[in-house]
Amino acid sequence: MRMLPGRLMLLAALGSLPAPAAAVNLVPNGNFESNTGCPTSFSQLSVAVPWIAPTAGTSDYLNACAPNVFPSVNVPQNEQGYEPALSGSGYAGIIPRSAAADYREYIEAPLSAPLVANTPYLVRFNVSLADDSNLAIDRLGAYLSVGPVGPVPNYVALPYTPQVESPANTFLTNANGWTLVSATIVASGGEDHIVIGNFHDDANTATVAGPGQWPGGAYYYVDDVSVEVATPTDQACCLPNGSCAVMLPGECKLAGGAPGGPGSTCTPSPCGPTKLRKSSWGTVKTMYR
């Protein structure tokens, strides 16, 4: 039997693999469109099942379906300002920095499946500062927990370090549109809830003046929350001959190599001085994707 050259064997193996599945959002009702009833006042986050307020803070649900007699929680115009939903007709609302000392509001939801250890996930949520806010803050984050964090019988800052957080001293001042907060994390394993809010007390929360005159502090809308398995990206591959190539992790393993991990490159080389030409893998790369 005639032996296939190495590259053709690799192409044949890749061709037999199933196509990668589309990313699945593990956050149920991440766009806040499903509800058990239209909101009629503030503090009704729980109608956007399965979202809850995990502490004594009174987080809100706003939706365009709110009756006209309850305009305070309507969309796009509501008591805190004007902002169309990023998608659909609903979103959540929280106070992450208040005129009341160390008062915090959070939103929490269970994931549809626990995160798998050592797997990269892309975590995203979007925020918009309400027009009437007299303050804006710099850090809003998402904490992925094992089990729920609530119920907590007070409303102070939760004592957790969020895996995803907007940068310190980069203030979330956009009140005319939405700001994406996102990062790729590597799961420890078992995380099955997501909590969004400000995880810092007043002393460690930087503020600037907001666009409005509401004396209550900073109010933010939250929409389109997602946690998805991260799409594989090129990384360093340590091949059996000790050389380094940049390729997808699936290509690397089929070539008998060891992936260097997300973000790794061949400069400086992690495994050898000789770098294979990336272009030689172009056909494989196209087929794998």
Residue spans for each PLM region:
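Extracellular/cell-surface secretome signature
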Residues: 233-273
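Short, solvent-exposed mixed-charge patches
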Residues: 288-289
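Aromatic (Trp/Tyr/Phe) and Gly/Pro-enriched flexible surface segments
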Residues: 22-117, 126-130, 135-145, 152-232
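Bacterial N-terminal signal peptides that target proteins for export
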Residues: 1-10
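Terminal processing/anchoring signals of secreted or surface-associated proteins
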Residues: 281-284
